[in-house]
Amino acid sequence: MSRGLGDVYKRQVTEDGPVRMADFYDGETYDATISLDKAAWRNAVQERLRVKPKLMADYGADVKEHETFTPVSCKKLGNALIYDFGQNFAGVVRLTVTGKRGQKITIRHSEVLNPDGTLNTAFLRTAKATATYICKEGRQTWSPRLTYMGFRYISVEGVREEDVQVTGVMLYSDIQQTGSFRCSNEMLNRLQENIVRSAKSNFMDIPTDCPQRDERMGWTGDIAVFAPTAVFNFDMNRFLDKWLLDVRAEQLPTGGLPNTVPVQGYGFPATMPKMAVAWWGDACVLVPWAQYMAQGDVGVLRRMYPTMKKYVNACRFWCGFGFGKHRYLWEMPGILGFGDWVAPDVPQMSQWQGRIKWTGTASLCNTSALLAKIADILGETQDAKHYRALSEKTADAYCSLLTDGNGKLMEEFQTAYVLPIYLNMFPTQQIREKAAANLAALAKRNDWCIGTGFPGTPYILFALCDNGQVDAAYHMLLNTKCPSWLYEVKAGATTIWERWDGLDENGVCPIGDDGTDKMISYNHYASGAVGDFLYRRVAGIEPTEAGYKTFRVKPILGGGLTSAFAKVRTPYGDASVQWETAADTFTVTVCVPVGTRCELTLPNGTSQIL
């Protein structure tokens, strides 16, 4: 910092300030008895850099204080006060206390409690997530400035309940919520709220995986599958544009992308060489495409096009070690990817990873097909032809080698059906519908419980609903058995969980030794990607041309729902749909912004242009 010495300013530094410790994961210690005016200062030494960094204006959306929460309960347990804010969120605690000089107050944070009512901090792993405040005399207010935590519960030690007031302050990037969804089912409304709250908790300058444990990193796989839901709910332009700059900067010369951007910790684990990683690296294609469809800005496609090409070419390389049609199957060892990550139908991490042949092959089919579309948009006709052919050959390899040729997987699991159905990999609609019927039968045998991991979860309801299995889709959406979206709601979740079985019906975490080292987060937005289905099929609104220049309203009725509403912000203004059913009557109200056109399709199949 600069200190004034008469008319002369010198750059001076000190280690004697009130912030005694500050760490991203471990928290902050602040001593209010220390004054900077009495600190020992010394002149700063100018560093001679070997590089010439380019200074740029801050590009992204600033992290700011937003919602605040007051505790819903406080219980004395031993020497600690246990507060429940009633809501899981990312942020800090604002402490107002009447204290004595030198009095030490310690605040610890957690998402869940142990059965005895104490904080469960085991799932934080190495993160201490602790804020410590040393009081000056009198009444004072403090909150950490150089860290943040993810939590619902806190323990406060070193002060009496009557002398302290605590407030939860939610922190996230300054993104505007521009979309909304609601319907006649209150559990679905709570699910939508949980999706939004989890997204906010993880939009912390970069799209993180979770806000509480010793990660909080820009995992590419999470935002890859969640981006379509994100752009329905928020204005994501500045936030994602900034992160995509990081993606471009982090791309390897070989074309692969780190698993976390910016690279930190798990960028490439020791078990994984620096290669293309299916679905995780796909973020460089899926995220810009979601932005483009929401806003119609071709600039994001143009900026990311070289990155996309290098990445898809890298995927083609890693997928090409076989002979014949096997040259288009992603047959790498499971340990070199994530496969069907956190699929609840198999218990071990190695089993999730072992499905990489199915998920990786579908990934290459999808990214090359999207890249062909993008090449057409950008006028790169030869590229479009090349990547379209690559996608078609990959789809053919999947269907020829992994299915019986008539819509049945040789090895059946939900994601293995979902991806080729949703991505139109089957050669005919008839075969696709047979595959959807097989998927529905598989889901029914599983009591309509979800069995998909990261790659399949965003698309399973579309795969069913759009291929003659509407009832099956609604059975899965509205199921309250574990694992399911609404089981979490029934269990009291206020955000989206990383693991479908994060808590049993007694409020106890059943996660055993599955190879993930206590990997359980209760604020992890990835499976909230179902929000895309809530907007596009339940409410029935989706763009048919980038930026909603033209869009479709086509509600798919089911599940006993009697009404739904959705609003989205388009470049032309707000577009919305409100529908209701009563007896034999269906009423729909559509708001069409000036300069756009809407195709409305009623449940009886009749259509008109608005």
Question: Regions from the language model: what does each represent?
Answer:
Residues 11-33, 54-67, 389, 393, ...:
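Non-catalytic C-terminal accessory modules of carbohydrate-active enzymes
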Residues 82-84, 144, 207-220, 268-281, ...:
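Solvent-exposed loop and edge beta-strand segments that line ligand/cofactor-binding
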Residues 92-111, 146, 157, 222-251, ...:
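Alpha-helical support elements that line or immediately flank enzyme active sites
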Residues 163-194, 198-201, 207-225, 229-260, ...:
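Active-site acid/base region of carbohydrate-active enzymes
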Residues 219-231, 237-242, 278-290, 357-372, ...:
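Well-ordered alpha-helical segments within folded domains of soluble proteins
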Residues 404, 408-512, 516-518:
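Extracellular polysaccharide-recognition and catalytic grooves
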